[in-house]
Amino acid sequence: MSKAQFSTKERILDAAETLFAQYGFGGTSLRQVTSQADVNIAAVNYHFGSKENLVNEVFRR
């Protein structure tokens, strides 16, 4: 994985962790995650495939 990919994935995970902690899974949209991580939805889909996979990765950290 390149440094840019690692950075993007980490930014998404950091944003998701913060938002899930603050608003819960149901109260957090992927749009909020992408906005906070400064990425587009395609990056989330590329790295995680779904919101469920994203939250699972947050828990694995």
Identify the role of each PLM range.
Residues 1-23, 28-38, 52-56:
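Basic, helix-initiating cap at the start of DNA-binding domains
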